[in-house]
């Protein structure tokens, strides 16, 4: 690649204004969206009393070239730390001031966890956004329906499905630069490519997809003359579906996901210590699933069953012993969620279900060997949700779950969620109070610092807000305030005198509160404005890498066969902490606020056959930090082409 690559990107954006004069055939987005996250069954968003952000297939298409982390980072109340860093940088999911352990991630109704992880958290880097059809982000404590970890929110991902045509497919290639603020290379060092084959007929559907990503050209750590790190990902997915009649259907799937990356050390006050040529990681995941569904006169019955294995091999430099140490982890998970919706009337239905989950892990490293004969537990959680949708405008969602854990016993969580739609006003008022739990991980129970006496963390969230549709439903505004409390968090104890260390349950209460506002305005059938603002205030102990203020603004111009989008983001200053090797103590620092501007242009050169897009990220080449001591991306260019057949 040479300077022609940059020129093509800029030229494509410039030509958008000439194409924009073509006649428009797109209609205003249907504001009566269907959501599934708050009941596990489809219902009108108007009848939902929860704060659910929906990212549709169309909106994902308008964000071509962005990663899953980039897309989620633009949602009100969601902070994905590391999304602007090098592609292999580990990610932090901070919803409403929470942490990774407090976010539940589901794909097609099946929970994703790494049973060998410190907090049972899942690595979002394993997921390719090119496999995704739709994302729902439901904020607030949601353990009643989603179990452990659903304390601050649920990221509910739906993968692409087979179309009704007998056969079709697509193939794509995307080339991008990989620059920091200090570099301006035009060489393509971020390469994405893949294909998809799918179709349906004679009651059978199928899908095969392969996606890959290779990134290099940046050091993960910030410093002069540091070696370049690398990141690669491969995703393979196979789906089969069968629908013998209108009432019964099922789907089976299998996936293989792999990431390989090199990484650097955390900042310790000495910049030269950050760069490390020996640190490397390999993560491999295999998932299988079975999803039957049966519809009858008064309801539906479904099972979401899946199993996964995640293996991680980590190589790190041991500066104390001057050796290279190897760490091997394997985590296995089995999940089966059987649930039934029964409608008593058109206004009243109940969801009854039971979720079973099994976890085990193996750990082999220089400090410990942990066998899955010991490191294992299971959960059996029956739950119920009652939903009442009155014709007078009152909606009520009541639910409860009994968490039964093989180690620590039982725990009850619940939710109360009323909402009211005014008949003569364009206004819906929502309120909720819900609780959640986070089970201790296998590592925290049985690892080298394990403590089998740990009890689950408890969370509770109270919300109050409204949604209004004005100007003939062209303008939608929703605002919600929240107050969140967490108790019995799991922490790490270290005795400097005896060098004894282990995990403990911290008795105490930490809180977070805030405000989230989202606005969508359809100026015309062609032009849409979307914006959001988030205010988050947390207790001092929680205040790391959490911006107090954050805002996003996006403008989309749709025209015949194309789309032009501009995105602006403001992220307030944040507090970061690090262990300073110079003074042997923890230090605190402030990271400055930053602003980003991105643009994307896409166009169908051949209708339903050939699409092209170009994107420029960090247009102003803003210098900023997400985490102290780590690089972030400067101005970069992407150019992509998709073939449809």
State what each model feature region is:
Residues 203-207, 247-250, 298-302, 347-350, ...:
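Repeated loop/turn-to-beta-strand initiation elements of outer-membrane beta-barrel proteins
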Residues 33, 68-71, 91-94, 106, ...:
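N-terminal periplasmic accessory domains that precede
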Residues 172, 389-396, 483-485, 505-579, ...:
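Gram-negative outer-membrane beta-barrel transporters
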């Amino acid at each position: 690649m040479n300077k022609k690559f940059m020129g093509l990107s800029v030229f494509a954006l410039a030509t958008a204004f000439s194409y924009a004069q073509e006649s428009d055939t797109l209609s205003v987005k249907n504001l009566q969206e269907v959501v599934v996250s708050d009941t596990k069954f489809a219902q009108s968003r108007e009848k939902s009393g929860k704060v659910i952000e929906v990212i549709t297939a169309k909106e994902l298409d308008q964000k071509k070239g962005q990663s899953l982390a980039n897309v989620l980072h633009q949602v009100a109340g969601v902070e994905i730390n590391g999304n602007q860093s090098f592609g292999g940088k580990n990610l932090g999911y901070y919803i409403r001031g929470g942490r990774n352990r407090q976010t539940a991630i589901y794909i097609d109704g099946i929970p994703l966890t790494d049973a060998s992880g410190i907090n049972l958290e899942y690595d979002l880097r394993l997921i390719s956004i090119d496999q995704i059809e739709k994302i729902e982000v439901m904020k607030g404590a949601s353990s009643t329906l989603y179990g452990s970890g659903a304390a601050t929110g649920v990221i509910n991902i739906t993968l692409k499905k087979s179309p009704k045509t007998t056969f079709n497919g697509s193939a794509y290639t995307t080339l991008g630069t990989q620059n920091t603020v200090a570099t301006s290379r035009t060489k393509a060092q971020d390469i994405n490519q893949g294909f998809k084959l799918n179709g349906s007929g004679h009651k059978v559907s199928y899908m095969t997809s392969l996606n890959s990503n290779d990134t290099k050209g940046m050091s993960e750590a910030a410093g002069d003359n540091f070696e370049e790190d690398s990141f690669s990902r491969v995703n393979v997915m196979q789906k089969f579906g069968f629908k013998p009649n209108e009432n019964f259907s099922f789907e089976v799937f299998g996936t293989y996901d792999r990431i390989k990356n090199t990484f650097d050390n955390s900042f310790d006050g000495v910049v030269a210590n950050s760069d490390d040529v020996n640190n490397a990681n390999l993560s491999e995941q295999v998932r299988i699933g079975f999803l039957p569904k049966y519809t009858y006169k008064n309801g539906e019955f479904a099972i979401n069953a899946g199993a996964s294995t995640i293996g991680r091999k980590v190589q790190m430099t041991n500066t104390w012993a001057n050796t290279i140490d190897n760490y091997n982890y394997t985590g296995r998970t089995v999940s089966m969620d059987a649930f039934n919706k029964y409608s008593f009337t058109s206004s009243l239905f109940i969801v009854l279900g039971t979720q079973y989950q099994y976890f085990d892990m193996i750990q082999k490293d220089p400090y410990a060997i942990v066998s899955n004969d010991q490191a294992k537990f299971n959960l059996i959680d029956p739950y119920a949700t009652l939903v009442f949708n009155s014709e007078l405008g009152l909606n009520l969602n009541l639910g409860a779950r009994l968490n039964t854990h093989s180690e620590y016993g039982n725990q009850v969580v619940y939710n109360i969620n009323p909402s009211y739609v005014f008949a003569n006003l364009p206004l819906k008022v929502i309120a909720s109070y819900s609780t959640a739990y986070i089970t201790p991980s296998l590592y925290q129970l049985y690892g080298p610092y394990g403590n089998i006496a740990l009890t689950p963390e408890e969370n509770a969230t109270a919300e109050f807000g409204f949604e209004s549709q004005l100007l003939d439903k062209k303008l939608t505004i929703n605002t919600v305030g929240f107050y969140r409390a967490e108790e019995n968090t799991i922490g790490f104890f270290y005795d400097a005198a005896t060098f004894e260390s282990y995990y403990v349950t911290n008795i105490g209460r930490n809180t977070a509160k805030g405000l989230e506002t989202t606005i969508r305005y359809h100026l015309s059938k062609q032009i849409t404005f979307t914006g959001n603002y988030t205010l988050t205030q947390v207790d001092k102990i929680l205040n790391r890498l959490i911006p107090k203020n954050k805002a996003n603004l996006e403008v989309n111009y749709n025209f015949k066969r194309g789309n032009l989008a501009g995105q602006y983001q403001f992220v307030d200053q944040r507090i970061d902490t690090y262990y300073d090797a110079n003074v042997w103590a923890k230090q605190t620092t402030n990271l400055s606020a930053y602003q980003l501007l991105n643009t994307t242009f896409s166009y169908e050169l051949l209708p339903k056959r050939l699409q092209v897009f170009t994107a420029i990220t960090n247009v102003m080449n803003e210098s900023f930090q997400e985490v102290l001591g780590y690089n972030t991306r400067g101005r970069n260019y992407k150019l992509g082409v998709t073939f449809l057949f």
